[in-house]
């Protein structure tokens, strides 16, 4: 049963908090935590019109904030406790802001048809918003915006990094607001990368064999990551130290071709080269 849970860093136990109605396939829900009010914000009915919900960590009570809002990718702005998210309707993606008491949403900016916006995060001081973008041609990028400029109607990023076809996933701010940590399949396997906001420098901080995902910065260059294993995703701690050299994974097909070059000639020919007349066995009326 899909549910919200609290994971203990001390012993690895998970406390069941709330069942999730209509979970997403891989991520269960879009989840945001407000430590000031000790509230979890999340989405339900994710394969319908998506409701925005709140769960009080002190009382254990759930309440519905917005019904059928079509809003996900939630994140809390620690400066004013507003919720930010992404709304999907008729192929149009819209960045929205939901101020307390979370009864209505305000449009910030709508992207052109076909462009995507996902994996939002807001800096600890509430001044910057980061997001991943997907273009119609398949190019993916990470961008950083000033929130004051967004509220003034200006949708121009101050920083960004183009990942090409390698999707940037789960990028989040470090506690000091200097870096963004996230994952990408840049080397053929999902590694964790650190993006420095001041100068736009990006560096790998992991060299995974099976893949690391969804980093959570703890401070002092410590991260919690999810490692992909045969038993599913397993939480692990990682020292986020920049690496100079990364090993690319070896694809079995590529290895076979290098060892046996004749495989390159094992290709199915074009149907246009087939002599169809020679294949006829009998002609007549079809009954």
Region spans (language model):
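A flexible loop/linker signature enriched in serine peptidases of the S9 family
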Residues: 1-5, 19-27, 36, 41-53, ...
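Residue-level detector of Asp-centered blade-edge/turn motifs that repeat once per structural unit
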Residues: 35-36, 78-79, 124-125, 175-176, ...
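A short beta-strand motif characteristic of beta-propeller blades
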Residues: 13-21, 60-66, 104-110, 156-162, ...
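Short loop/turn segments that connect beta-strands within beta-propeller blades
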Residues: 8-12, 56-60, 99-103, 147-151, ...
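C-terminal, active-site-flanking charged/polar segments
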Residues: 191, 199-258
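Outer-membrane beta-barrel initiation region
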Residues: 184, 239-287
């Amino acid at each position: 049963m899909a549910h919200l849970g609290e994971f203990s860093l001390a012993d690895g136990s998970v406390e069941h908090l709330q069942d999730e109605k209509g979970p997403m396939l891989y991520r269960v829900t879009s989840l945001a935590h407000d430590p000031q009010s000790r509230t979890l914000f999340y989405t339900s009915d994710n394969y319908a019109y998506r409701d925005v919900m709140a769960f009080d960590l002190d009382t254990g009570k759930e309440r519905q904030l917005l019904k059928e809002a079509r809003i996900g990718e939630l994140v809390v702005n620690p400066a004013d406790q507003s919720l930010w998210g992404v709304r999907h309707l008729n192929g149009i993606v819209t960045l929205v802001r939901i101020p307390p008491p979370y009864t209505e949403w305000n449009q910030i900016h709508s992207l052109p048809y076909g462009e995507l916006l996902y994996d939002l995060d807001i800096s600890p001081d509430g001044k910057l918003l980061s997001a991943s973008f997907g273009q119609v041609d398949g190019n993916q990028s990470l961008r950083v915006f000033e929130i004051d400029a967004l509220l003034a109607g200006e949708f121009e990023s101050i920083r960004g990094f183009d990942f090409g076809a390698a999707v940037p996933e789960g990028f989040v701010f470090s506690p000091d607001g200097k870096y963004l940590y996230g994952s990408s399949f840049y080397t053929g396997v999902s590694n964790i990368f650190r993006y420095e906001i001041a100068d736009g420098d990006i560096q790998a901080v992991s060299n995974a064999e099976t893949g690391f995902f969804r980093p959570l910065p703890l401070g002092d260059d410590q991260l919690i990551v999810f490692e992909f294993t045969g038993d599913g995703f397993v939480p692990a701690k990682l020292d986020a130290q920049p690496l100079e050299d990364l090993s690319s994974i070896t694809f079995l097909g590529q290895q076979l071709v290098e060892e046996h070059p004749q495989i390159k000639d094992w290709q199915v020919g074009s149907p246009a080269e087939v002599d169809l007349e020679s294949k006829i066995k009998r002609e007549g009326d079809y009954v």
